[in-house]
Structures are given as structure tokens and as C-alpha cells.
């Protein structure tokens, strides 16, 4: 067991990326569990802004970890609609699937994940905020509001505003999307949206907003609610013609709602840039701290996916006594996860510059067959492609 606040591995952040890293590590190198600490700045259950979509890729990773997502309160979304001004196409997460994806509330999902980590022997120190880290050849020192910690390896799983990332990459271009979100009651009598479906509407693109408005069904304290919001990828340099809150209020008005009646919250999402650094000697990044989906801002499956690569890099570091972690970025970029993320970033930069309302209407209303093929071939189902590669190699 470690002495005092000295550990072999410290994971900063007890969200999906951090817990996935821990659980993958338990599978790969169970001897490291007792030498690993997870630090969380808040206490579970803590509020967390997120649309809450759980794609099939996320379920595959959870299944590989021996976890069953249906233990968490959730809604099975019947169809996912991709529209322009209320008209477009629909699809499901799997071509012959029974639903599009599941929707959870992050405070419940993250609490469940943390409990699973504790069940497998991990220690989590909550209410412990990391203020700074200093990496040297001998190890890493973490300064927190609860004192000083020491580790051989640190995993930055502390989100888009990552303290760990700033420590190893102090000067970089910002790659941060913007998101606003509200939770409303379910009012089927006022909305033309089917209550069992989710909706992505790209009607805001002609206004210079590089994204969409969304409307998901969810369950909160056992009651049906709708999670609604607006996403701006911010992948291009031009600014939107209108503020995000104005565009969101306009969309809500179409459903008999008013933004002023609800609590509006916002948060950034760091999107994936293949040119960026994901590690430094003794330190690596996962989840939002590394970068997630630029196209839709989808982060849960991506965060869970990073965990396997981080755990493998950590195991290799201790086995080889080489803590440079220089192979970590290459392992991600060469994997189907990295390929999917690169495609999403490229397509976001291409697609969101096409502001013509006529073009957007044509794409979503007439090209659904092509969109569904492209989404399956390049953006999702990366876990399935990765498994095929593994089987081919064995």
C-alpha cells in the first residue's frame, strides 16, 4: 500500500474518462489497484451539464468492463431525428436496433460509475480540488486544497478546463465548443416533437452557429422531462450572427416554451485536435481534457473509450520502467476511436461553414441515406471496427 499521500498512479477526475481508466487498469494490471488514487473536486452525486446520450459504442465499452448501463435510470430513445427546420431524416444507433440511444442524467451515471470503481478496490478522495501539478524526472507533485500528493504517473481526467492539461500544455490555441442547456417539463400538448424521440435540428447554421439545437427525453427523480439545448462547435473562426441564448429561445418558442422560465446553464467542450499533445512524461490526458467529438459534442462514449488506451499506456510504463508515455498519442490516432474523432473534426470544419438554408434543407431532407451510411462508416460503431481488427490480429 502507498505511504501517506504517495501513490504510483493518481487519476484526477472521477467522471467517465477517469473511472474508465481505473476500471480498465483493474482488468489489465490488478496489482496496481491498491497503488492508485482517484481525486474528485466535488462529491458524488454532483451536478454535471450534459445531454446524457449513451450511444451503442459506450455500451460496448461498459459491457467489456462488466457493467450494465440499465442499472442506471434511463430513457430508451425510439428514433433520433436529424432535421432542418423540423424536417429531415431519422435513424437508430444500430441499423437493426430497437432504439436510437439511451439518455441518462450525468449525476446519476457518474455516481454509479464511482461506486463500481470503489467495489473493485479503488480509493476516491472527494472534495479534493487539484490546484497545480509539477512533473519532474522523479515523479509528479500535485498541489490540492487538501494538501500535497505525489505520484509516478498522473492521468488528467478533469474535463475541458483541465488543470492537468494547462500544466503540461501551457500555451495552445483554444479548441473549445460552447453549449447551453435547460431541463423542462414534458409538455406533449405544446410540442410537435414525439415524446419518445430525440431531435437534432440544424436550423441555426444559417445564423452562423456551428452546430444545432437539441431536444432529448430524460427522466429526473422518476419523472419524465426534456433536456434541451444548443451546441456551437466553434471550429471555425467566424462568429455567430446572434447570441446562442437568443437562438435557443427562438427554438423553444416553437414548442410553446420561454427561456426565461427555466434555469439556463452552460459549459465548454474541448474538441479533438489530432495535432495536439495528449501526454507528457509521467502525465497523460483522457476524455474532455484530451478532446472529444467536435461535430456533435458527444463525449460519454469517447471518454469511456480513452480509458482503455490510458490503462495500457500506464501498464506499459510500469512494466518497461519507461514513463515517457510517448506511445500514447500514437495508439489513439491509429485506433478506430482516433480515426472516428479525426473524421468528426474534419467534417465539422467542412459542414458548418455551409450556411445556405437551401443547402442544409436539401442535405437533411433528401440525403438521409448518404448521411446514415457516412455516420455508420466514419463517426460511430468504432468499437465494432476495433473488435474486428483485434480478431484479425489473433
Predicted regions and their residues:
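Beta1/beta-strand and adjacent pyrophosphate-binding region of the FAD-binding site
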Residues: 2-17
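Conserved N-terminal helical subregion
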Residues: 60, 75-76, 81-167, 173-177
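Central beta-strand plus flanking loop segment that forms part of the substrate or channel wall
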Residues: 62, 161, 167-201, 257, ...
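Conserved FAD/dinucleotide-binding core of flavoprotein oxidoreductases
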Residues: 207-268, 300-301, 317
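C-terminal helical "tail/cap" subdomain of flavin- and related membrane-associated enzymes
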Residues: 312-394
